[in-house]
């Protein structure tokens, strides 16, 4: 991969100032103060909210506490989506800090998966990495790794260790020089305006004539409504890690530098703010 390490670091250390507030109908023994945290964009809510849980449990009786879950403006937050994706998709046009409501009751079974432990997050994360490598390298790279390498990827993410994670992850970002890129680009496109969870299709980084495919090429093929017509008004923002990459950006470069730790490009299509 091309070595733009500053980009990788900026992506990894991206943070979202967040205010956690206990839901008003939760039963407490005294008033629950809000809890403030800088959330890592590349992580998952269930990995980084132990302190939030402890903070609110201090003012609650044990019998009033069941499985914790989070919500933003009425939408339950999926723990298996990276934090940065949740913010870009649901709150990118709102003021900071991001206001998240904490619940300990009435778990929304229809909307959320249960997360009994961090093992569930690890299993989901490794499953995504394996799927991404199946697309990129027919699973050859991830399958040639030892179990300790898989563990190092997970521990690097869990403990927020950039160098520990990238020492192994860089192998997943390599490809034979004669091929100009991966077999397929692992991506998922999310929209708030549809019931479908996300769009995911096979898409090559290089065209048959050797030209590099761009972000715009991908969108025009799989989500044309996200791209404004040349003479038309821009109706959507295309967000990755809180920024709007230029549509001319090569998809291979984006995959190498703006993928989340699970090796997927998580792309949010949100309505253009009207202000």
From Swiss-Prot:
Impact after mutating residue 130 to R: Loss of conjugation
Q: For this entry, list what GO says about its biological process.
A: aggrephagy; antigen processing and presentation of endogenous antigen; apoptotic process; autophagosome assembly; autophagy; axonal transport; blood vessel remodeling; cardiac muscle cell apoptotic process
Q: Where in the cell is it found?
A: Cytoplasm; Preautophagosomal structure membrane
Q: How is it modified after translation?
A: Conjugated to ATG12; which is essential for autophagy, but is not required for association with isolation membrane.
The signal sequence is none
Bilayer topology: Peripheral membrane protein
Q: Does the keyword Cytoplasm apply?
A: yes
Q: Which GO terms describe its molecular function?
A: Atg8-family ligase activity
Q: Which domain of life is it from?
A: Eukaryota
Q: Cross-link (Glycyl lysine isopeptide (Lys-Gly) (interchain with G-Cter in ATG12)) at which positions? A: 130
Tissue specificity annotation: Ubiquitous.
Does the record bear Thylakoid in its keywords? no
Q: Which Gene3D superfamilies match?
A: 3.10.20.620, Autophagy protein Apg5, helix rich domain, Phosphatidylinositol 3-kinase Catalytic Subunit, Chain A, domain 1
Q: What is its main location?
A: cytoplasm
Q: Per the record, what is one GO cellular component?
A: Schaffer collateral - CA1 synapse
- Swiss-Prot/TrEMBL keywords: Acetylation, Apoptosis, Autophagy, Cytoplasm, Immunity, Isopeptide bond, Membrane, Ubl conjugation
Where on the chain is N-acetylmethionine found, per UniProt? 1
Q: Which family does it belong to?
A: Belongs to the ATG5 family.
According to the record's subunit comment, the protein's assembly and interactions are: Forms a conjugate with ATG12. Part of the minor complex composed of 4 sets of ATG12-ATG5 and ATG16L1 (400 kDa); this complex interacts with ATG3 leading to disruption of ATG7 interaction and promotion of ATG8-like proteins lipidation. Forms an 800-kDa complex composed of ATG12-ATG5 and ATG16L2. The ATG12-ATG5 conjugate interacts with RAB33A; this interaction is bridged by ATG16L1 and promotes ATG12-ATG5-ATG16L1 complex recruitment to phagophores. Interacts with TECPR1; the interaction is direct and does not take place when ATG16L1 is associated with the ATG5-ATG12 conjugate.
Give the function comment from the record.
Answer: Involved in autophagic vesicle formation. Conjugation with ATG12, through a ubiquitin-like conjugating system involving ATG7 as an E1-like activating enzyme and ATG10 as an E2-like conjugating enzyme, is essential for its function. The ATG12-ATG5 conjugate acts as an E3-like enzyme which is required for lipidation of ATG8 family proteins and their association to the vesicle membranes. Involved in mitochondrial quality control after oxidative damage, and in subsequent cellular longevity.
Name assigned to this protein = Autophagy protein 5
> Gene behind this chain?
Atg5
